[in-house]
Amino acid sequence: MTRDNSYSRYCIFLLLTTLFSLFFNTSYGYKERERAVESDTLIVSDAVRFLSKYVAIPSVSGQENEAAYWLAQQCDEKGLNIEYITNNLGSVNFAASLYPLSSGKPNIVFLNHMDVVFAGDEKLWKYPPFEGVMADERVWGRGSFDNKGLAVIQIFAVEQFVDLAAKEELPFNVTVLCVSGEETGGLTGSALVAKDFIERFNPMVVIGEGGSGMDELSFLEGTGPLFGISIAEKGCMLVKLSWTSDNAGHASIAGNYASLMMINGLYKLLNAPHPIIMTKEAELMFSSVGEKLGGIKGKVMSKPSSKLFMRFLKQHAQKNPELNEILTNKITLSGLESTKTSYNQVSQEEAAILDCRLLPGETPEGLVNFIKSALQDSLVQISIVEQGPLPLTTEPEYFFNLLAYALESEFDGASVVPMLLPASTDNSYFRALGIPVYGLNPMIVSPDQLKAIHSYDEFIKFVDVDRGIDVFVSFIKAALE
């Protein structure tokens, strides 16, 4: 997940639990695979062992080549058709498919990224970050959850249809698309793949990372886990604020210098409250949960634009970041730049880099106007230095229903709702092409698991991998029927 997504994914898990605690006070053939657990003896599945090896290959953004070539070779040995989209240093992107892409078949595309973020101080890890340690029924290491675990789930699910595809002419292709550079904005990965994606892949749907499951939420009265399938996400752009001053450079006589103007401006901007916005995506998410909940409380929630519910949201959103993420744009200070040359010399130019996340329907121009209004500074220069695709939405349709069916089949009593992902992923490059795109990590996750993403002690449970494979196998099988 890109940049600040680890925090945002944690917000996803906490969002509904916080919201409700405040509001309520409260028949084609395919290869069968053995379950990971038999009786009292734990059996480590082939998929888990595969993931352990994959995690042990470091693939920090820009250094994905070794991991990419290993993964492509493994997919080839499993009988998948390999096609490199790009094959350059720091930019390897390949497809592993049931049929060659040249077949032109309509295509179900599973998307994952091979790059990971830096591990940080390895001494702070419970286990080394690049050894793929299997312990406590978990695979530990950088990328085990984000995003190598999902890749293994996708590959092992699609592999189970290789023999069938060789015997019969299936009505569609299934592809696992493995890309580079997601953690740094996708410019070496999905941005390149998307250029001729429709012509080369003939996609019916793209399924990438996104929502996941939360277990036994009290407001659903113990009926089972709640899964969110993301249908939209926030857009991303980097904004640069620059201040210049021609005051004397010596620190002992400086007046209203650039550093002071920057500090005062950033204080005002970063403490300015963003307006609460009920997007149609958030409205659909809240109303879907309300329908699942039922009763008087569910009826209130099923109308999230009502004065009663909006009053509640405005009262609590500012105090609860996990709720605020869904309902507001976000500006985060991500870096500072200075022309300062010595400690007794005042810099005449200072700059701040802002990581900005936009709700669907919001525009870069609108956010720039918000920045100007908050700063009230005629001397600041504002420029957009990087901008991803504008946030678009996939309306839930046939493939959403199949994913929901697969989750409900695997997890007893599960409820599935569409959701807005308060983060940015590579999914946005493909939504921008007008293709149905959904985000799903097909597993139940815990707060400690999500908090470890992009941090220390990242892990994925063995059972997450095995059950996730079953979900996607069920999805593909249902599509064939």
Where do the language-model regions lie?
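Bacterial N-terminal signal peptides that target proteins for export
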Residues: 2-13
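Bacterial N-terminal signal peptides
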Residues: 13-22
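Bacterial Sec-dependent signal peptides at the C-terminal "C-region" and cleavage site
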Residues: 21-38, 214
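Acidic/His- and Gly-rich active-site-bordering loop/insert found
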Residues: 30-142, 148, 163-172, 354
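Short, solvent-exposed loop/turn segments at the edges of secondary structure
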Residues: 91, 127, 171, 201-202, ...
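An extended, acidic, His-containing surface patch that forms the Zn2+-binding/catalytic region
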Residues: 103-105, 214-216, 224, 275-340, ...
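Acidic/histidine-rich catalytic neighborhood of metal-dependent amide-processing enzymes
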Residues: 138, 145-228, 323
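A short core secondary-structure module
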Residues: 191-196, 249-275
